Curated annotation (Swiss-Prot):
Pathway: Protein biosynthesis; polypeptide chain elongation
Coiled-coil stretches: none
NCBIfam families: efp (TIGR00038), PRK00529.1 (NF001810)
Gene name as annotated: efp
GO biological process: peptide biosynthetic process
UniProt keyword Protein biosynthesis, yes or no: yes
Protein's name according to its UniProt entry: Elongation factor P
GO terms, molecular function: translation elongation factor activity
Pfam families: EFP, EFP_N, Elong-fact-P_C
Source organism per UniProt: Ruegeria pomeroyi (strain ATCC 700808 / DSM 15171 / DSS-3) (Silicibacter pomeroyi)
Length: 187
């Protein structure tokens, strides 16, 4: 595994640090008036989700880990485990449902997601950035309601509540950004 200097750490890098695998969530490069430059890094443990703030000097060396990325197709859920199939090898794997966190409701049958592996252990799963959902409940459209930046609550077919523009009505299909969990556009 390649070693990188502390000032080369970027958000999204996976590092081996203190015997664990950590993802750099936020990186601030600081150059104080006195003393050497350093990187203040917010790390998230890929195995248990705990967070850690660490300071790396420019001269510090850290192990950067490359994760293998594979597309996996969602098949079904069983006993809190999500079952996926590798599209190339047709091999099935089970992942804990909490691996997707609050984005779990956006997972749909047959959806292809990106799973990151380290030495055949699944560490992270990423949904597509945009997903199409149906609005099952929202307030009716009121004509003449054109106040700037006004949004109304809506409940999607997966139970998630999002804010939508006033012109969007019930039973309409919309596109939701899975990273921000916000309305993106009409489908």
């Amino acid at each position: 595994m390649p070693k990188i200097n502390g000032n080369e750490i970027r958000p999204g890098n996976v590092l081996e640090h203190n015997g664990g695998l950590w993802a750099a969530v936020k990186v601030d490069h600081v150059k104080p008036g006195k003393g050497g430059a350093f990187a203040q890094v917010e790390l998230r443990n890929l195995r248990n989700g705990s967070k850690l703030n660490e300071r790396f000097r420019s001269a510090d060396k850290v192990e950067r880990v490359r994760l293998e990325q594979k597309d996996q197709q969602f098949l079904y859920e069983s006993d809190g485990m999500l079952v996926f199939m590798d599209a190339e090898t047709y091999e099935q794997i089970e992942l804990p449902a909490d691996l997707l966190g609050e984005r779990r409701p956006f997972l749909q049958d047959g959806m292809t997601i990106l799973v990151e592996f380290y030495e055949s252990e699944a560490l992270n799963a990423t949904l597509p950035q945009k997903v199409t959902c149906k609005i099952v409940e929202t307030e009716p459209v009121v004509k003449g309601q054109t106040a700037a930046n006004s949004f109304k609550p809506a409940v999607l077919d997966n139970g998630v509540k999002v804010m939508v523009p006033p012109f969007v009505g019930q039973d309409e299909m919309i596109v939701v950004n899975t990273e921000t969990m916000e309305y993106s556009e009409r489908a």
